[in-house]
A protein has these predicted regions:
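A short, N-terminal "cap"/entry segment at the start of jelly-roll beta-barrel domains
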Residues: 1-32
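Compact, glycine-rich, soluble single-domain proteins
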Residues: 22, 26, 37-46, 65
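General beta-strand recognition
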Residues: 35, 45, 62, 88, ...
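Residue-level recognition of conserved beta-strand positions in structured domain cores
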Residues: 38, 48, 65, 91, ...
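Short, conserved beta-strand element in jelly-roll/cupin
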Residues: 48-62
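Short acidic-glycine-tyrosine-enriched beta hairpin
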Residues: 67-87
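Ligand-binding loop in jelly-roll beta-barrel domains
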Residues: 82-104
Length: 104
């Protein structure tokens, strides 16, 4: 989906790693949430609360989930992170992404 309709958008950005990862939260009429963001090149460790589906619009990223090998993704691509998971990212180039939060 290239466009979202009927959403509320947070004015304030979520800023992580001194601005190397930024996103804006959007909430849909049904209460579901996504973030739209940018990641700059670097290595990061993040955590999930809910299951997340990350859609890479453009850019190249490596993902390391617990008990797995590094996996490479280049946009357009998507991957899923389970709930309550600590994971690592190696971002090779500017990444434009959309993250969907899935409550289970």
């Amino acid at each position: 989906m290239s466009y979202f309709k009927g959403v509320s958008i947070a004015k304030a950005a979520n800023i992580l790693y001194d601005g190397n990862i930024t996103s804006r939260a959007i909430t849909f009429e049904d209460g579901s949430k996504k973030t739209l963001g940018i990641m700059l090149a670097g290595e990061y460790e993040l955590n999930t609360v809910n299951k997340e589906i990350i859609d890479i619009q453009r850019g190249k990223i490596d993902l390391l989930l617990p008990a797995n090998e590094w996996q490479e993704f280049e946009g357009p691509a998507s991957f899923t992170i389970p709930a309550n998971t600590k994971f690592k990212l190696r971002v090779h180039s500017l990444v434009d992404y959309c993250c969907s939060f899935i409550k289970e």
